[in-house]
Amino acid sequence: DYINRRAGRVLEIGVGTGLSLDRYATHLQVTGIDVSADMLDKARRKVAERKLAHVVRISEMDARTLAFPDGHFDTVVAMHVISVVPEPEKVMEEMARVCKPGGEVLIVGHFARDKGFLAALERLFAPLANVIGWHSDFELGRILGVRSLEVIRTMPMPPFGIFTFLIQRKAEAARAAA
């Protein structure tokens, strides 16, 4: 719902089979990228079958080297992918680069807790979780180092606050250069 209150161009990193594409409001112009050609074929079929005219492009692309100009998107989204991509810090830099000044970078993911019983469980099971691609020990701080992005809000999400919704705003050009 938050994304649908935004306007303009949206880039979804790790769009996969397009699970979220029909949930975007029709006033948005959505581009989805992923590294899996097979998953993108399914996403393209979904766009065609459901006549999702607001989805303007589906492309095979590595999020570490986005083939878009600086400041091209009003909103850049990564749902449940930032902890599993190679070089997440580089991905964040690229997301910030293609986001317009004043635009937002939105992340949904699981981030390790730093204290409490659940934090201890995450650390205990991290080796097993990593084998299946779930990085329960991935720390939020790893992706907060992009100078041009300011954290606006973090919110726990269902179920049980396991996931976090992170909202970052890209600084206006003059502030980002400072």
Residues covered by each model-derived region:
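Conserved alpha-helix/loop element of class I SAM-dependent methyltransferases that forms part
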Residues: D1-R9, L19
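Class I SAM-dependent methyltransferase SAM/SAH-binding core
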Residues: L11-I13, T17-T65
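Short glycine-centered segments of the SAM/dcSAM-binding site in methyltransferase folds
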Residues: Q29, G102-E104
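A short acidic, Gly/Pro-enriched loop at the edge of an enzyme's catalytic core
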Residues: R64-V76
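A short SAM/SAH-binding and catalytic strip from SAM-dependent methyltransferases
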Residues: T75-E87
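A short glycine-rich, Lys/Arg-flanked "PGG" loop and its adjoining helix->strand segment in the class I
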Residues: E89-P101
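C-terminal alpha-helical "lid/dimerization" subdomain adjacent to the S-adenosyl-L-methionine
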Residues: L106-T164
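C-terminal lobe and adjacent flexible extensions of AdoMet/dcAdoMet transferase-like proteins
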Residues: F165-A178
